[in-house]
Amino acid sequence: EYKANREEAPDDLAPQFEYIRKSVEAFNLPSIELLNYEADDLIATYAKKITEAGAKVTVISSDKDLMQLVSNKVRLFDPMKSKVIGEKDVIEKFGVKPSQVIDVQSLAGDSSDNVPGVPGIGVKTAAELINKYKTLENLLKKASEIPQNKRRETLLSNKDKAMILSLIHISEPTRHRG
């Protein structure tokens, strides 16, 4: 279900992939392509391995899902806005720390990743709840204690929707060409 709404690459984009591959090869840059792995999952996996080795990482992307990777060792560069995105920027956009972005997206939903979210809960309310309860798991455990009747009932009856995460998967395969 996750990313089920993902469309195939547009007809005018797909032919460009081979040009990108050839350009990367011409510059003698290593490249990574693994069947059945999302690019953001590979990016997260490599970012983790690189930071564990003691280096800092800059990820070049405008994909907001990658904001959950931001830390004192990982930053994003959004080429569309020509802007470096650090922890403060993530907090400004989502109202929570980067490590909590996934919980906010799970509650508020994200149609581009087929994450339904909880009806009636947007990013602002999701951020308030996550800031108060610290994690989605803790919020759902304590949902019966929420004082607002409608919010409490909505959360209790939509726990399954809240648990559909847009979590980036960090996995072991890290083979590359180049």
Question: Which stretches of residues belong to each language-model region?
Answer:
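Noncatalytic, basic helical substrate-engagement surface that gates or grips nucleic-acid strands
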Residues: E1-I60, K64-V84, K161-L167, S171, ...
